[in-house]
Amino acid sequence: MRNPLGLRFSTGHALLASALAPPCIIAFLETRYWWAGIALASLGVIVATVTFYGRRITGWVAAVYAWLRRRRRPPDSSSEPVVGATVKPGDHVAVRWQGEFLVAVIELIPRPFTPTVIVDGQAHTDDMLDTGLVEELLSVHCPDLEADIVSAGYRVGNTAAPDVVSLYQQVIGTDPAPANRRTWIVLRADPERTRKSAQRRDEGVAGLARYLVASATRIADRLASHGVDAVCGRSFDDYDHATDIGFVREKWSMIKGRDAYTAAYAAPGGPDVWWSARADHTITRVRVAPGMAPQSTVLLTTADKPKTPRGFARLFGGQRPALQGQHLVANRHCQLPIGSAGVLVGETVNRCPVYMPFDDVDIALNLGDAQTFTQFVVRAAAAGAMVTVGPQFEEFARLIGAHIGQEVKVAWPNATTYLGPHPGIDRVILRHNVIGTPRHRQLPIRRVSPPEESRYQMALPK
């Protein structure tokens, strides 16, 4: 349980308290209520130094006032994006105004066939971005910019039958293994801070846009040289779609959406804590700026009114600012997973769950037997894929919420997994004891077989 009380020292509050304390004591010194002056001075020290859930009393008053002012207003929308060319022919980067900042987006491309292994509640994968690397690149190439590393996704999907989704949630438990996740770096340029750098390229907004575009291109190139595939965004469509929560109204402790609720939290535990919390949609934001400690916030969207997960702290009175990246909490540098963890395919000999993503590249999947076929299709449906099976699987399709078609496949938002031979694409083999990919020829695994999944195998045609 987090202790709601804390201490915070600042020069301004200390000077104000030290200036007011002596007059308060002197004013009551010659009266019969001499103790009142000491009490007022002590109260001033408490107001200046003691915090309650991260804010002083004055901070809570300001938060309530700000919330009352904005709660009736719709959120400010971003400007229409403009695409500007850099000095490299054909390399376009979209920029737009977001509040007082001009922003550009860099999408991080997941590394195909990268498994995630969960060991003692921690996700181990090669597909990672070090926030310290981003700060280093900013310091070298554009020290007057700041970057938001934004990841959005979900642990389980909502396209399958409810029983299938519920069963898969029980199987994966609290593993920090989202079925779907995409990551972007949003570069933010403050016109005042970047004035000198922008004026070297052009006057006014044109110079600022050119500086931001050139910086985004340079950061993407440097990330690629460090093994992180990054592409400058030509539009904000994918980013906006992934981070949309259907905002309707801000409340004191949550945001009411069109058909769900979203709550903003501080969670110092890092991505393993953030992605282990049950939610229909998760958005994480880590802000990095040269010479400053990273700041972060987490937004969890649920169908019902949210309950604060263990290790999280609700940002009362600051829900909309957290959504817009204006209310972040100090954190530390960490390794952020880039792509999806994917579907549970088995476990190691030490009983550590193994997940494999299938949503980033088209493949032809060869499944070893009926049980492996059943487990993969059921779990893929629970992970948010649209499953299509043949007409002979009608009963099976009805149980899991699949479609009937001539081609057996699993359709992800950005890729398709064909359950059989398919020309022109990579081939993956999944057996009860091994998974083979173009990257890992033979990755030993053991089957994970919860008894509840057997009912779906019984629905297969004999």
Swiss-Prot record:
Cite a single Pfam family from the UniProt record: EccE
KW Chaperone (keyword) present = no
The topology of this chain with respect to the membrane is:
Multi-pass membrane protein
Q: Which GO terms describe its cellular component?
A: plasma membrane
- Kindly state which keywords UniProt assigns to this record, in alphabetical order: Cell inner membrane, Cell membrane, Membrane, Transmembrane, Transmembrane helix, Transport
Protein localization: Cell inner membrane
The disulfide bonds in this chain are: none
- Annotated transmembrane regions: 9-29, 34-54
Family statement? Belongs to the EccE family.
**Family matches, as NCBIfam families:** T7SS_EccE
Q: How does it assemble?
A: Part of the ESX-1 / type VII secretion system (T7SS), which is composed of cytosolic and membrane components. The ESX-1 membrane complex is composed of EccB1, EccCa1, EccCb1, EccD1 and EccE1. Interacts with EspD.
What the protein does?
Answer: Part of the ESX-1 specialized secretion system, which delivers several virulence factors to host cells during infection, including the key virulence factors EsxA (ESAT-6) and EsxB (CFP-10).
Q: State the remark under miscellaneous.
A: Was identified as a high-confidence drug target.
Q: What is this protein called?
A: ESX-1 secretion system protein EccE1
